[in-house]
Amino acid sequence: TSGGIDSSSVVMSALDVGKEVRVYSFTFGKHFSSDFEAARKLAWEFNLTFVPVFLPSDRDEIVETVKHLIKNVGCKKKTAIECLFPFYYLIKLMKEFKDETLVTGVAADGHFGLSKKAMIHYSKDDQKFKKFRQDYFSNLESAGTKRLIKLCELNKIQLCNPYFEPSVFSLWIDKNWEELNKPRQKEVIRMHYPELDFLKIKPHTNLQLGDSKIAETVGNAVISKYKPNSKSPIGIYNRIAKGVYA
């Protein structure tokens, strides 16, 4: 969990139906991001086992994992690589604990139109906002969902991704942006989980961005390995996919 409302709500829902829950969250070394701290706080509050997933800082290990995600999992886009990177290590740790099911809040953002693009182009127009969500949830590539499914399949882990389910989509597709996000972002979720108000949940941030350092650490590793003067890792990812960088 990131300690945000999406992943925290699935924790609470799992507890509500009597499941045994172990909370995982990732971090680079002792750089504890706000997401990591919030996840730890959530586990503490509800007396759940908390498992820190320590991501590697070694350049060559990061690069080899990126290659695996591109070649074997099928990640093509920069965001998919960066988002799947921590899940690779999380799933490895799950297998050590013999946990069989991964429950995530992945793709929840698609219901709410909180990206910069969605806020500018869709939030004020109900029909455009509806089409944006229909397009988003008709494409398994959204939020790296298809690649996360593949990563779990390769590791024989069952994936439960409730926010991508049609039953959840149908709950909110006829609501406009303000009905979903006022008075707080993702209000239609938050109102049902008042027990999570103590987390003081921050506004939307992509998993790999913010203070997690995932995007910059992964990107800098491949740049350092293959093209030190490059300003972006995108070209390097493409060359790995084409086999230029074996």
Go through the PLM ranges and name each one.
Residues 1, 22-27, 52-54, 103-106, ...:
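Short beta-strand segments
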Residues 1-46:
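ATP-dependent adenylation/pyrophosphate-handling site
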Residues 10-14, 42, 86-90, 189-192:
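Structural preference for long, well-ordered alpha-helical segments in enzyme cores
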Residues 36-73, 104-106, 111:
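A conserved beta-strand->alpha-helix junction
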Residues 77-83:
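Short, flexible loop segments at the rims of nucleotide/cofactor-binding pockets, characterized by
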Residues 94-99:
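Glycine-rich phosphate-binding loop signature in dinucleotide/nucleotide-binding domains
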Residues 102, 107-127, 139-230:
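Mid-to-C-terminal catalytic subdomains of enzymes
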Residues 228-246:
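Acidic, carboxylate-rich catalytic segments that either coordinate divalent cations
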